């Protein structure tokens, strides 16, 4: 549900005030919970109910903190879980709801086959427009600094609520990063080996909304821009739920973990490089799949060729303040190359339309021709 007016807020209150939800466990981040003023909203709506607010501390979904949350949930015994925050909070909420009533999990638990069983209801309230996690059947979890993706149909939230009032307090830097995440997810999913007619349809809706509204959303957002970017994020989530992301996301996790670069910004560092790599490969092998995907890409983005597409993306990153220059960000690629390669997420990399080897990644990161096809 996209909560755009008081009419929708009344509907939301009615849902939360149902008698069956007497004990509510809220997972959130302290800064976003207070800045978005979600704390005022929930304290008022839930004042006659018992509720517990857990503030996550980690920048990533880590197994130690997840187990701590599971313990707290088991102690509190809720009949409703709420996730209020960005992608990390929503992933914690999804994983917590799925693995409850366990008080802890291990790495092996991510690879078991689970039978369908009744789980606690989960409602999520994104405070950024970007991750699309509210629409996906998977969640990210880090174990000893290594990223894993847990996938199960039953992990998806029962309901999601984009409350425009919560989104309005998101800082410019966060809007730029999370908004580009929505853009990259919808565009990456176009090239995924798993993409199909349905995922392409969702990608097209997301791309149309994000490209028209992204810079307004970052610089001088009005209510309509928050709504349109929330819509773009949601449909990017639906697209990657089918197709998944690929190479730019596969490398992004290292830059976030090692250098503290926000996720969407980290994706932007290599996004154009990989799209240009795909295009160069297409010129060589004349792949029918890539020809169809690039035609779809140019049509959706209203560009005529790879040169115009490059200029479009470069304009978005420049005007939104997303610096994609490794040197200016003080990232020494040569010094960190071994770590970059060892921490590249193979699960995401395998979704790429062509096989990418370690030597390709080195070439893509160092060769300037992949960073910009802006002129013929």
Language model segments and positions:
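Short, amphipathic C-terminal "tail helix"
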Residues: 333-376
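ATP/NTP phosphate-donor binding region
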Residues: 1-80
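Short glycine/serine/threonine-rich phosphate/pyrophosphate-binding segments
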Residues: 9-10, 34-37, 63, 88-93, ...
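Short Gly/Thr/Asp-enriched flexible loops that form oxyanion-binding sites at enzyme active sites
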Residues: 70, 89-103, 135-138
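C-terminal and late-domain segments of enzyme folds
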Residues: 172-235, 239
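Gly/Pro-rich interdomain helix-loop hinge
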Residues: 257-336
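A glycine/threonine-rich phosphate-anchoring loop and its flanking beta-alpha core
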Residues: 101-195, 288-289
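Glycine/serine-rich anion-binding loops at beta->alpha junctions
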Residues: 78-94, 127-133, 261
């Amino acid at each position: 549900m996209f909560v755009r007016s008081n009419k929708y807020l009344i509907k939301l209150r009615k849902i939360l005030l149902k008698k069956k939800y007497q004990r509510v466990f809220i997972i959130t981040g302290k800064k976003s919970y207070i800045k978005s003023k979600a704390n005022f909203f929930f304290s008022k709506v839930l004042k006659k109910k018992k509720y517990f607010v857990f503030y996550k501390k980690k920048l990533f979904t880590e197994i130690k903190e997840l187990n701590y949350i599971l313990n707290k949930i088991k102690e509190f015994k809720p009949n409703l879980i709420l996730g209020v925050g960005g992608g990390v909070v929503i992933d914690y909420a999804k994983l917590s709801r799925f693995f409850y009533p366990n008080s802890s999990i291990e790495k092996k638990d991510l690879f078991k086959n689970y039978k369908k069983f009744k789980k606690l209801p989960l409602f999520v309230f994104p405070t950024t427009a970007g991750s699309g996690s509210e629409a996906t059947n998977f969640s990210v979890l880090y174990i000893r600094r290594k990223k894993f993706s847990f996938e199960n149909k039953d992990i998806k939230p029962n309901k999601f609520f984009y409350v425009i009032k919560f989104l309005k307090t998101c800082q410019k830097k966060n809007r730029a990063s999370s908004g580009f995440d929505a853009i990259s997810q919808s565009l990456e999913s176009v090239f995924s080996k798993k993409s199909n007619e349905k995922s392409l349809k969702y990608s097209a809706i997301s791309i149309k909304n994000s490209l028209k509204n992204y810079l307004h959303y970052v610089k001088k957002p009005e209510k309509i821009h928050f709504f349109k970017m929330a819509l773009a994020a949601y449909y990017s989530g639906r697209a990657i739920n089918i197709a998944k992301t690929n190479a730019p996301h596969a490398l992004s996790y290292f830059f976030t973990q090692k250098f503290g670069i926000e996720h969407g910004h980290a994706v932007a560092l290599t996004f154009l490089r990989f799209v240009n790599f795909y295009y160069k490969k297409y010129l060589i092998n004349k792949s029918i799949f890539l020809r169809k995907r690039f035609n779809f890409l140019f049509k959706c983005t209203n560009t005529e060729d790879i040169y115009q597409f490059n200029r479009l993306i470069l304009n978005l990153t420049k005007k939104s303040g997303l610096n994609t220059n490794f040197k200016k960000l003080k990232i020494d690629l040569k010094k960190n190359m071994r770590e970059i390669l060892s921490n590249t997420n193979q699960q995401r990399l395998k979704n790429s339309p062509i096989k990418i080897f370690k030597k390709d990644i080195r070439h893509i990161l160092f060769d300037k021709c992949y960073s910009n096809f802006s002129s013929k």
